[in-house]
């Protein structure tokens, strides 16, 4: 068993992958078991391509209920209706009250013009490799509008300016990173740019978490 592996190969040879669908109790017990054997090799970020030290717990950045009353939303890297149908329903409710929803996504995430069953005010369709640049372009447009230095090289093109102006208006705003953004090879760049835009526009920044208990297992570890 595990004790024999620990004895013959060392504690560092033991690891555990915990499903983000696990309960907090299950995730905690898995971590406690591994630490009891002298190993800290336990993780629930099963599809991540990049890991950032000290990034903290990834969560929505606002309450679920508040999604229904947002006035401005920017979604990055999410097939919103398929990946997060309940969040999509909340955001759809917000659009019925006049909310503007913008998206930076690939064609896979937006398979058709009405794939999310809600109106999109502005859309940047790009391969995943171009999402960081698209966010940098929005950041450049925000920086130009506010007269501050941009955090990265970008072009304030017409699409970027339209998204920037949307986020600079309104009061209740959110930038939401989807599953494909969390799994992105440059996930840290997407988060840094999103956080900068959020700080400049007053928008909350968060992740549309990928599984039933993604947030809970991060706390439990």
Predicted regions and their residues:
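Catalytic alpha/large subunits of respiratory electron-transfer oxidoreductases
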Residues: 1-221
């Amino acid at each position: 068993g595990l004790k024999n592996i620990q004895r013959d190969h060392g504690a560092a040879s033991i690891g555990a992958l915990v499903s983000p669908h696990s309960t907090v109790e299950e995730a905690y017990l898995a971590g406690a078991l591994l630490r009891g054997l002298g190993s800290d090799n336990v993780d629930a970020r099963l599809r991540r391509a990049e890991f950032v030290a000290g990034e903290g717990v990834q969560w929505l950045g606002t309450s679920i209920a508040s999604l229904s009353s947002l006035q401005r939303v920017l979604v990055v890297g999410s097939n919103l209706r398929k990946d997060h149908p309940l969040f999509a329903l909340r955001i759809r409710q917000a659009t019925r009250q006049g909310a503007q929803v913008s998206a930076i996504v690939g064609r896979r995430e937006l398979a058709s013009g009405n794939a999310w069953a809600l109106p999109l005010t502005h859309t940047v369709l790009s391969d995943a490799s171009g999402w960081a640049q698209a966010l940098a372009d929005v950041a450049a447009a925000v920086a130009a509008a506010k007269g501050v230095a941009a955090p990265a090289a970008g072009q304030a093109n017409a699409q970027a300016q339209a998204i920037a102006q949307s986020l600079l208006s309104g009061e209740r705003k959110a930038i939401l990173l989807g599953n494909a953004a969390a799994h992105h090879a440059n996930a840290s760049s997407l988060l840094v740019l999103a956080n900068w835009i959020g700080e400049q526009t007053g928008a909350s920044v968060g992740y549309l978490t990928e599984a039933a208990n993604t947030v809970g297992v991060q706390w439990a570890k």
